[in-house]
Structures are given as C-alpha cells and as structure tokens.
Regions:
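Short, structured beta-strand/loop micro-motifs enriched in basic residues and often containing a Trp
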Residues: 24-35, 79-87, 192-200
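Short, well-ordered loop/turn sites that connect or cap secondary structure elements
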Residues: 44, 92-95, 209
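A generic structural signal for residues embedded in beta-strands
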Residues: 52, 100-103, 217
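Short, Lys/Arg- and Gly-enriched loop/turn segments at beta-strand edges
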Residues: 57-69, 108-119, 223-233, 326-328
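Intrinsically disordered, low-complexity linker/loop segments enriched in Gly/Pro
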Residues: 107-209
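Conserved mixed alpha/beta catalytic, RNA-binding, or beta-rich assembly cores of soluble enzyme
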Residues: 161-167, 172-174, 178-284, 296
C-alpha cells in the first residue's frame, strides 16, 4: 500500500470482498477507443477481485499466419483509434471524481501466442522510432511457454517472459489537452483513443507493472471505469519499433480499492522494491520533467523522513532511476523509480 506517511487509512476494510470473472467477448471488448458512456460490463465493490480475459490486437485478428500487409489493413480499418483490444469497462461502486483507484495486480496467466511487428515505414513514416529506416515492415510470431516462462526468438536466442498490461485505463479525463501531434484524441462520437497515455493511465507501457505490483490512478468519472488490454509478455524500455512482445491473457487478476484519502494527478505505481512516478508528453524532455516533479512531490510530502523540497530534488538526482517507458505512443513516457531500501528509519 502507499505509505501511511503520505496517506492515512491505507488498510481498508475488505471484509465481504467477492471474486468475479470478466471474459473477453465482442460484447465486453472495444477496439482502440475508451467511451465513458459505454455500459459497464461488470459492477464491483472496492476490494473485490476480478479475473479479466484479454484479446490480441484488433479484436484477436492478428494471429500466426497473418501477414504484415493484412496487419496494415487492420490498422487502417480503425483510423485514429489504437490497435488495442480493451476489455471493460468495470464500474467500481463508490469511486468518485477526485478519488484515487489503487489497483493491485495479483496474477497474470498468458495464452500461448505472441507477436511483434513494425509497420512499413514507407507508409507510416512517423510510427516507430526509426520508421523511415525500415520501409517494408516486419512481423514475427512466437509460441509462449507458460511453464518455463520463455519463448524462442530464433535458434540460439531465448527470451524470458515478463508479462504486464501495456494498457490499463480508467475513464478518460474530460479536460485532456488537445493533441499536439498525430490523429485526433477524440472521434466524432466523443470517444477517446487508446493510442496515448495520460493521467487516467491508458497506453502507459510501463514494464514494471507486473504481477505483484500496484498502480494508482486518478479517478475522472463516477465508478472509475476500468479497461484492460494491450497485453504484453515482454518489453524493453522504449518499445522502440512500435510493439512489445504482444500477447493476450487467460486472466489478469486485479483488486481495485477506492482511496478517498489519497489524491494524485499523475499515475504512480509500486513494486516490492520501488515507488514509481510517471510523466507523459509529446516532448520527451517535458515527460521527464513531469515524472521528476512527481518524484520530488512524493519525497517532499512523505513523513517517514521529513525533508525540504530542495532536499527532495537532491535525493531524486542521486537515487531516482528515470527510464524512458516508450517513445512510440505519440505522447512519450518516462517513469522514475525510487528504491524503498533507502528509507531505513523504522
């Protein structure tokens, strides 16, 4: 839980919590758009657990044997929207705008197919860090071994699998700023594209959000509205060619908890070893500044070892590991990691 020194009442009463399953079907999954007016597919209470199934990109249409040309056609079939298949939304009783939703990622179980692709740079010259240098596009498929948690890239190269959700979104921010680049954020129906990360989470691509981690998101709409998708089984920081090792999940089990006592603007996360602070902007330098400011805010506000804002800035410079989450989602992402081990006062 987030430190009691920062927010009180961090052990909510979860007596009576229930467990649910939300399968991914055409009725429970949307392709590339978030819509706060979408009818909830499940209604839960704070502290309940949900096992969510997810699909591969483009409503499970990218599977072994599908060519890069066919992937291009699928991409063009949903202009402005993301390629992501997102399961939801899930309505959380009691969640109100201004609250924080604390989302525990309890378990991730993969399906067996995965892929990575980059779109043809000659057709999509700005999609992917080096798109113009790779004009033809490329797709590669993988079989994922859940027992060994590995996959073979090619003979002689075996990859360890580290699954995490690339997209975990709450209902969109009604005041999200207008796009500075790329296709419009909103379509004619008022839906929000899953392409860009923002304060409500969405396409964050932070590879630390693995099993056992906890994500904290600002609630913008009544009921919070949780969507899950863009399932990843491995990703390097940067996600440079456009995609990770994209996959889908038999289930990702989450436990959302409504926090009335914690108020944040930007996404935060924690693992057993680190606190994590995020920033997103079309300008990578601005994304870095946002993430660093959020780190400083946390350190200056925490009461475990009180410090000035100047001391927090200094400490951030010495211990925060600020990583480029992704550079391919129009809004670029940075996440700064502060090790918990530096706080030795009991």
């Amino acid at each position: 839980m987030w430190p009691a020194a920062v927010a009180q009442n961090t052990s909510p009463d979860l007596a009576g919590a229930k467990s649910y399953v939300l399968r991914a079907t055409p009725e429970t999954t949307q392709w590339g758009w978030l819509d706060s007016n979408e009818k909830p597919k499940l209604v839960i209470n704070s502290g309940d657990t949900v096992a969510i199934e997810t699909l591969l990109h483009s409503m499970d249409q990218i599977k072994p044997g599908v060519s890069i040309d066919e992937i291009v056609k699928l991409r063009l079939a949903n202009p402005g929207g993301g390629p992501h298949s997102v399961t939801g939304p899930i309505y959380v009783n009691g969640a109100e705008p201004g609250d924080t939703l604390e989302i525990h990622i309890k378990k991730i179980a993969m399906k067996e197919d995965g892929f990575n692709f980059n779109l043809p740079g000659k057709q999509f010259p700005t999609v992917g860090l080096l798109a113009s240098e790779f004009p033809e596009g490329h797709v590669q498929y993988f079989k994922l071994d859940a027992k060994t948690m590995t996959t073979e890239f090619k003979p002689g190269i075996v990859l360890p699998l580290k699954p995490f959700p690339g997209t975990l979104a709450l209902g969109p921010d009604p005041d999200e700023p207008k796009e500075k680049a790329g296709p419009p954020i909103h379509d004619a129906k008022g839906r929000t594209s899953t392409l860009r990360p923002w304060k409500n989470g969405s396409n964050m691509d932070v590879n630390e959000l693995q099993e056992g981690s906890t994500l904290y998101l600002h609630v913008f709409v009544k009921g919070a509205l949780i969507w899950m998708g863009d399932s990843h089984c491995l990703q390097g920081n940067g996600e440079v060619n456009l995609t990770a090792l994209e996959c889908s999940y038999k289930e990702i089990d989450i436990q959302p908890v409504v926090r009335k006592d914690l108020h944040i603007d930007w996404p935060r996360a924690e693992t057993s070893t680190h606190w994590i602070f995020m920033g997103f902007d079309e300008d990578l330098n601005e994304a870095m500044k946002i993430a660093v400011r959020n780190t400083i805010d946390f350190l200056a506000d925490q009461k475990m070892v009180p410090m000035s804002r100047e001391e927090a800035y200094s400490l951030t410079s010495m211990v925060a590991d600020c990583r480029v989450s992704e550079v391919v989602d129009i809004r670029k992402g940075v996440h700064c990691m502060v090790p918990k081990s530096i706080f030795t006062k009991k």
